[in-house]
């Protein structure tokens, strides 16, 4: 929803934009420890439409380097296409929507407790739909804005091989559905030079069960299931700077708190040009 935050209460009929971002997420639960450092780039274009709508399209690429238990590592790449829109409901209220589709590839090397090495690669397609409602209050240059958001995400089932020097194992991952609800508040100051803001929120995962089966060449099978239900918080501090009446840059940093899964940090930097 970051793209839509930057659109709100800005002038201009049409605009092109781009951003780069990077960070690290971490998961430590169900006896599993993993983290990933990533960087990404995104670019898009949007314009105004009748009835107080603004909508656009964007392309996103992300490269990640993962670290797993016992020294394992992974190299992931994500490619995604997004359609987004925002409607001004007047009197400070708004609704945002984002639909995204793409796929992620991961090439990995794993180790067990005995330091046996296993290698493999996987590819999964995914989709997500997010909606948010909020309302801005305030007078003069200062404002505060409560908001609620719900996101559904889906990963399709995937099948791939994991091998070492002496054996091959087939992994069948079942489809995965995530249902995340967020509630938060943003406060800031709007000035002629740009904006300053701070955003705090709490999120809860209602779904997030991962299931997979493992089949060895000798006929042995095993199944695993992990419940990723969790609650965590996030804090963002950032601002924008107006380069001209039709162009601006922005930067912000986000930190996650609590929960087995969290975004330890993320740094965003980008620009927008209207014409």
Where are these predicted regions, by residue range?
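Short hydrophobic/aromatic-rich motifs at helix boundaries and adjacent loops
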Residues: 13-17, 53-57, 156-158, 208-209, ...
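Outer membrane beta-barrel transmembrane domains
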Residues: 82, 87, 167-275
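Outer membrane beta-barrel translocator domains of Type V secretion systems
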Residues: 1-147, 252-266, 270-273
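Generic multipass alpha-helical transmembrane bundles of integral membrane proteins
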Residues: 149-151
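Short, structured loop/turn "capping" segments at alpha-beta junctions
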Residues: 140-145, 155-159, 192-196
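Solvent-exposed, glycine/polar-rich loop segments of beta-barrel outer-membrane systems
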Residues: 30-37, 69-71, 105-123, 154-177, ...
């Amino acid at each position: 929803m970051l793209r839509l935050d930057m659109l709100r209460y800005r002038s201009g009929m049409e605009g092109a934009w781009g951003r780069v971002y990077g960070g690290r997420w971490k998961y430590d639960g169900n006896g599993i420890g993993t983290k990933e450092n990533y960087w990404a780039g995104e670019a898009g274009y949007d314009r105004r439409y009748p009835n107080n709508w603004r909508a656009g399209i964007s392309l996103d690429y992300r490269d990640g380097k993962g670290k797993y238990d016992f020294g394992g590592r992974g190299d992931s790449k994500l490619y995604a296409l997004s359609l987004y829109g925002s409607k001004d409901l007047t009197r400070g209220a708004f609704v945002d929507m984002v639909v995204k589709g793409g796929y992620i590839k991961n090439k990995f090397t794993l180790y067990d407790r005995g330091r046996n090495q296993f290698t493999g690669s996987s590819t999964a397609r995914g989709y997500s739909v997010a909606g948010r409602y909020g309302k801005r209050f305030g007078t003069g240059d200062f404002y505060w804005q409560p908001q609620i958001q719900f996101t559904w995400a889906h990963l399709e089932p995937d099948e791939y091989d994991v091998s070492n020097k002496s054996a091959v194992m087939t992994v069948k991952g079942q489809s995965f559905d995530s249902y995340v609800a967020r509630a938060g508040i943003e406060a800031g100051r709007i000035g002629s030079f740009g904006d300053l803001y701070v955003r705090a929120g709490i999120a809860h995962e209602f779904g997030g069960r991962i299931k997979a089966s493992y089949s060895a060449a000798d006929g042995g099978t095993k199944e695993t299931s992990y419940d990723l239900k969790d609650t965590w918080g996030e804090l963002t501090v950032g601002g924008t700077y107006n380069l001209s009446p039709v162009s601006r840059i922005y930067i912000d940093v986000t930190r996650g708190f609590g929960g087995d899964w969290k975004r330890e940090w993320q740094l965003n930097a980008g620009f927008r040009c209207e014409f």
